[in-house]
Regions:
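Active-site acidic/histidine clusters and adjacent loop/turn architecture
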Residues: 2
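Long beta-strand-rich cores associated with HINT superfamily self-processing modules
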Residues: 5, 9-145
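Intrinsically disordered, low-complexity acidic/polar and Pro/Ser/Thr-rich regulatory regions
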Residues: 148-155
């Protein structure tokens, strides 16, 4: 039902909060505006810009706990990682996704090789799961390097 999709990438997973604040500072975010049915609840007003669904994060078990449950709906997915926002903008629903470069890399490879045609191929699913774990570790390591750099600069 969304006609426009935007992906935003960041280097470090903990930078999600800056992305989240950017979205919530520019678009009205009130639970009473959240839609239940995108077609039945459609708002014809093209001047009213708002967040149309509670923001969501899809995260994997073992991910660091950096998300605030009050600000964003946390969905524990076995593998997929991404932030999702549905915005009502100029009469259209716009989906905005945010993820790290490593998450995007895994997602594109998985989508190209496994989904939607080879979802029953156990070997491909195993390789996709392994690549997902490696991308998660790469995210953790990049964040660790960033913290190390900050510590070194303090001294």
């Amino acid at each position: 039902t969304d006609l426009i999709g935007i992906r935003v990438f960041f280097l470090y997973r903990e930078d999600w909060i800056h992305f989240h604040q950017y979205i919530t500072n520019r678009f009205e975010n009130k639970p009473e505006l959240y839609i239940k049915n995108r077609l039945e609840d459609f708002d014809e007003d093209i001047t009213h810009y708002y967040i149309a669904e509670k923001p969501k994060v899809y995260k994997r078990a073992g991910d660091t706990k950096i998300y605030d449950k009050n600000e964003i709906e946390i969905i524990a997915d076995g593998i997929y990682r991404s932030l999702h926002y549905i915005i009502k903008y100029k009469g259209y629903y716009v989906e905005i996704q945010g993820r790290t470069l490593f998450e995007e890399g895994w997602s594109e490879i998985d989508h190209d090789i496994v989904y939607p045609y080879n979802t029953d191929d156990e070997m491909l699913k195993d390789f996709s799961t392994l690549l997902n774990r490696l991308s998660g570790m790469a995210d953790e390591m990049s964040s660790y390097f960033r913290r190390m750099k900050g510590e070194r600069e303090r001294f």
